[in-house]
Amino acid sequence: LKAIEADHPELVTPDSPTQLVGGAPQASFNTIRHPTQMMSLDNAFNQTDIERFEASIRRSLAYQGDLEYLAELKIDGLSINLFYENGTLLWAATRGNGQEGEDVTFNLLGISGIPKTIKSAPATLEVRGEVYLSKAEFERINLEREELGEPLFRNPRNAAAGTLRQLDAKIVAKRKLQAYFYGVGSWRSLSEKTQAGLLEWLDAHGFRVNPLREVVKNADEVEALMERWRKERPKLEYDADGAVLKVNSLPLHEELGSTSRAPRWAIAYKFPAEEAATTLKAITWQVGR
């Protein structure tokens, strides 16, 4: 479908599956509308994809000078949006379909790295982040569920999503959700002019920010960084499925704009799927009718 729409842009409609983000909110939670749309990201899988991404940016800007990108390790978790008014946290919501999400404020209040108040904050501020469970906590939860005869979570991301959407606050409190923050709904109310500076601002104001980030200048530097992060990946305390590459200049974000579902100034560079060996120990034959 993406290929057809690329060849025939006149066929693209707002309700096309390629233009939608995430899924509909669950009925068991109140729905909150995001003041600024929470977008998805287009994907890259190799250096050629990154070179095409950079070429697309240069065409859009008609620019041949140096460009900087901020590469941020991409945690495999659940996207959230925090809304502050006059420096006070009013609500927290999941991404949902990008326009509306589920109100999960109460379930997030116990997570460290989410300040309830911010000093010297703009009148309104949206802060975007990723909620996740560590590998160790995921194993602990599944062991507990196995002992209780309950179905196991398939992976830490599913466990984090299930925990965040729990209606029983006692269960949420027992599971050690964590979060990292990586952006805002609009940067114009802040003085920072780079993505790197924005993350420093978030860190200085009490938001937990992933230290695994680095400024890079071209596809070769991106590939070298990705190779290093691939090697470090098994040692991480959480699941990571790649890196997010963003144009470092925030004013250029505005100039580049976005499609209906993804920004043109950022891309997710995915790690190859993890591989593991397994041993087939037995086969039980059954005859069907």
Where are each of the predicted segments found?
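Phosphate/adenylate-binding "loop-and-lid" substructures adjacent to NTP/NAD/dNTP-binding pockets
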Residues: L1-K119, E139, N158, L164, ...
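A broad, low-specificity signal marking well-ordered, structured residues that form hydrophobic/aromatic
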Residues: M39, Y69, L90, L125-V127, ...
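Short solvent-exposed loop/turn micro-motifs enriched in small/polar/acidic residues
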Residues: Q64-D66, K74-D76, T124, W229, ...
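Short secondary-structure junction motifs
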Residues: Q64-E68, P122-T124, K174, R233, ...
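Flexible helix-coil linker/hinge segments at domain or subdomain boundaries
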Residues: G110-E126, D203, R208
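Long, charge-dense accessory insertions within large macromolecular proteins
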Residues: E130, K135-R289
